[in-house]
């Protein structure tokens, strides 16, 4: 509000100094007062609809985690949970001998503890365990940049091994970055409100909120910046409800129980890839549109990694890469690299830069960027692409 008043004062003083016509100056000053009044009223109106009590980002989640006996602090309990999860995910032998894995976990744990995000991670992990194991609600394997966290994988927050797919932690949490930390949880569409009710019963109505985004309010950005905090979104996906219903029908028809491991089938099944190659993907999340099915027939994907690449390229910013990627896969175009050091990171995608992780690793390898700096570079490049596409 003070900024608006100061801005209007400066505008009025400028009008007085530069105007040669008194009547014209009075008209301009009146309009300036009207503009300032409208802006102030909009902000007051917006704040009256959002009586937020802004607190420390992690303080609320700290209050929700109970530290078991035998642990002196939340950080100690968090580290113990991560280590136990690492042994389950990777095995005791690998955890003991793999220096790269040890260093990655240690690095992530330090960043998380420094930012006091331990309770945030534990809260999400406990919520997913409760909904999946005890409430029998299916959830997705992990969405967006949280999939780059080995700690999240060890805690059961995601089912994607970041080390296997070359995913980077700094895409999710960057101490020198500007984006807020947020985790999206995909759950069955029909069960979303059941999870909301569970949260209300266990943590109280005052701890939850249904959020909407009103794009027409230009002044909303100021409130959003002030109110940045740790949040998570529960997103209902119909495909998960359909998958669960299919498994129930199979059990009923064939009389055999389908375990939850069926939600993570082998990724090299020839019959499955034949369906993709023939574009029989109606109802398959991300692969059901007419244009995507056309690309599937042209690309003829034969590996899980190629499906990931096609899904990634099917975006306004980089959709033009599909043509070159497809030609290189089928030997219709030579695979080239602008620098010999690039082959290490681009070989899997036939020399085409598709992922932000590739940009980050290349900048670290060639320009000696830190992981945090490389994340900012990748974001800047992607933002530029988005601006140009618009």
Per-region residue spans from a language model:
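Alpha-helix N-cap/helix-initiation sites
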Residues: 22, 37-41, 121, 139-143, ...
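Terminal-proximal interaction/regulatory segments of ATP-powered molecular machines
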Residues: 2-56
């Amino acid at each position: 509000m003070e900024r608006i008043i100061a801005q209007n004062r400066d505008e009025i003083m400028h009008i007085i100094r530069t105007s040669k016509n008194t009547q014209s100056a009075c008209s301009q000053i009146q309009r300036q007062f009207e503009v300032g009044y409208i802006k102030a009223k909009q902000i007051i109106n917006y704040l009256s609809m959002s009586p937020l009590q802004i607190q420390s980002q992690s303080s609320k989640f700290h209050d929700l985690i109970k530290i078991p006996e035998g642990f002196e602090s939340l950080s100690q309990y968090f580290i113990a949970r991560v280590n136990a999860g690492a042994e389950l995910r990777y095995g005791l032998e690998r955890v003991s001998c793999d220096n790269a894995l040890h260093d990655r976990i240690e690095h992530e744990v330090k960043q998380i503890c420094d930012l006091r995000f331990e309770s945030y991670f534990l809260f999400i992990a406990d919520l997913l365990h409760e909904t999946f194991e005890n409430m029998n609600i299916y959830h997705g394997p992990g969405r967006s940049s949280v999939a780059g966290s080995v700690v999240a994988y060890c805690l059961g927050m995601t089912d994607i091994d970041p080390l296997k797919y070359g995913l980077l932690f700094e895409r999710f949490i960057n101490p020198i970055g500007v984006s807020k930390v947020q985790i999206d949880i995909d759950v069955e569409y029909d069960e979303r409100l059941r999870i909301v009710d569970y949260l209300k019963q266990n943590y109280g109505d005052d701890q939850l909120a249904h959020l909407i985004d009103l794009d027409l309010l230009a002044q909303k950005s100021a409130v959003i910046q002030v109110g940045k905090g740790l949040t998570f979104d529960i997103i209902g996906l119909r495909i998960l409800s359909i998958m669960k219903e299919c498994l129930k029908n199979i059990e009923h028809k064939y009389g055999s129980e389908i375990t939850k491991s069926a939600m993570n089938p082998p990724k090299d099944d020839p019959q499955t890839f034949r369906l993709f190659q023939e574009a029989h993907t109606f109802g398959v999340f991300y692969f059901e549109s007419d244009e995507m099915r056309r690309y599937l027939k042209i690309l003829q994907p034969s590996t899980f990694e190629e499906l990931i690449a096609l899904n990634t390229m099917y975006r306004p910013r980089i959709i033009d890469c599909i043509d070159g990627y497809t030609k290189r896969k089928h030997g219709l175009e030579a695979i080239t690299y602008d620098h010999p050091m690039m082959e290490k990171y681009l070989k899997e995608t036939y020399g085409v830069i598709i992922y932000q992780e590739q940009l980050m690793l290349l900048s670290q390898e060639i320009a000696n960027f830190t992981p945090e700096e490389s994340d900012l570079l990748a974001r800047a490049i992607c933002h530029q692409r988005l601006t140009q596409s618009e």
